Amino acid sequence: RIRVLVTEIGDLGRASNIGIENTTGPYLSFIDVDDWVEPDYIEKLYSGIQKGYKICKGNCIMYDGVKNLPAYQGRSSGEISIRGASFLLPCRHSSVYDRSLFEKLRYLEFSYYEDLSLWPILVATAGCVYYINDIVYNYNQTNETSIMTVRNEKHLVLDKVFGHIFANLTPDLDKEVNLLITALFIQSFWTSNYQYVPKDEVGQAYLKRVKQVVDNRLVGYYYIVENLPVPKEMKERMIRFYRN
């Protein structure tokens, strides 16, 4: 049965939460309105759930209007540990979830990176992820309003995003989630978000907020940075940011 819920609030986090709160089935999956899925999308992902897992994630095509490249290459289907999940895109889509994971969890609303705001907590709550190396989803990056297309200061929200993550981090979760959170911070902040930070008072205030949120919370940060395949100058910048 399909039930259409209409909201005047154009926010992905809010729309996802409305869906969560109005579903009654045992499983959930999210599909963005401008993306499309393969005919066997649910069938393939549900096959992972049937193996006893609470999250099953599949491969997807990153469609930019010219090239159709798979998000993951050289991977095999199978169980992915909490720590090993750092290679998976922290997105809602391309997945089927056991609804029980959302019993006490909701996405960050009115913010970019709302997917990231819950991903490590969901993985830790599930205990692991079952990955299927089949293309099940097509992620459309041509939308002019997509986070992948818009390049402005709306990206300066990682303080809120990681604040939401830490607010949902409970003592009963496997400690490996801390390493996943650190890896996700390095990926999201240093490989993407940092380039949007303006070199003015607004930018400095944002960097200060981010530092306050993650201060002494990123387990293994220095070790991960030291082992990154990036120039020495970049490593020093990353270490200086977290140390100061």
Regions found by a protein language model. Give the residues of each.
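Flexible acidic/His/Gly-enriched loops in nucleotide-sugar-dependent glycosyltransferase catalytic domains
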Residues: E38-R106
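Short aromatic/hydrophobic "clamp" motif used to bind/position activated sugar donors
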Residues: L28
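Glycine-rich, basic loop-to-helix element that forms the pyrophosphate-binding segment
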Residues: T7-T23
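Conserved nucleotide-sugar donor-binding catalytic segment
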Residues: E79-E153
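Membrane-interface aromatic/basic loop that binds lipid-linked glycans or pyrophosphate carriers
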Residues: Y53, Y196-N244
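Catalytic core of nucleotide-sugar-dependent glycosyltransferases
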Residues: Y137-T142, T149-K175, S188, Y196-L218
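The conserved acidic donor/metal-binding loop of glycosyltransferases
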Residues: D32-W36
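Acidic donor-binding segment of Leloir-type glycosyltransferases
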Residues: R1-V6
